[in-house]
Swiss-Prot record:
GO terms for biological process: homocysteine metabolic process; methanogenesis; tetrahydrofolate metabolic process. One of its GO terms (cellular component) is cytosol. Keywords: Cobalt, Metal-binding, Methanogenesis, Repeat. GO terms for molecular function: cobalamin binding; cobalt ion binding; methionine synthase activity. Residues 94-217 form the B12-binding domain. This is Trimethylamine corrinoid protein.
Length: 217
């Protein structure tokens, strides 16, 4: 049987090789070996995702590669999630995050990973899905009173809709009741600052860390 370091290395490899089946296999192997799921995700899957992200930034890989890597990571996380849910039921929620992919954008993989990581970190996550109308984000803030509302955009053409969330939350009189987070491949800190978003999630790990910091949890 492989030791912990080998299993974690294999988890990273599954992501950098865009291998869904290997990611699932490694996740099952890790659970059987009693490896902490959070450690597997952070040192294995996320480390692999960060490597893919760096290569994408350097022009060595392209968006389909990033999506394939994210798909593999999602496959692994799905295996681990039931175990994480079991643990989470024994601890107090850190807060509620409503998250969705912005209107006009059918890509959900990045949003799915961030949602999974927030869930694992101890937040109650309300997944609004993909191609979510702006008014749905606003209505969910009024209805659920989450601490954070997050929108993901994978295209520059849909990214502009994130401005509408900020504006419509203000019009509805609830902007000061919630933190807003934006993320996605074309999204930057400059963009978040420009539109007035509270949090920019560069990666899933970054999003979790910044949500925790923003809420002081």
């Amino acid at each position: 049987m492989a030791n912990k370091e080998e299993i974690i290395a294999k988890a990273k490899e599954a992501i950098t090789d865009f291998d869904d089946e290997l990611a699932e296999e490694v996740a099952n192997e890790a659970l059987a070996a009693g490896i902490d799921p959070v450690e597997l995700i952070e040192k294995g899957f996320t480390a692999g995702m960060e490597e893919v992200g760096e290569k994408f930034g350097q022009g060595e890989l392209f968006l389909p590669h990033v999506l394939a890597a994210a798909e593999a990571m999602n496959s692994g996380i799905k295996v681990i999630t039931p175990e994480m849910e079991k643990r989470k039921s024994q601890t107090k929620s850190l807060g509620t995050v409503a998250i969705g992919t912005i209107e006009g954008d059918i890509h959900s993989i990045g949003k799915d990973i961030v949602a999974s990581m927030l869930n694992i970190a101890g937040f109650k996550v309300v997944d609004l899905g993909r191609d979510v109308p702006i008014n749905t984000f606003v209505e969910k803030v009024k209805e659920l009173k989450p601490q954070v509302v997050a929108s993901s955009a994978l295209m520059t053409t849909t990214m502009v809709n994130q401005i509408q969330i900020e504006e419509q939350l203000k019009e509805a009189g609830v902007r000061d009741q919630v933190k807003t987070m934006v993320g996605g491949a074309p999204v930057t800190q400059d963009w978040a600052d420009k539109i007035g978003a509270d949090i920019y999630g560069e990666s899933a790990n970054d999003a979790v860390a910044k949500v925790k910091a923003a809420l002081n949890v």
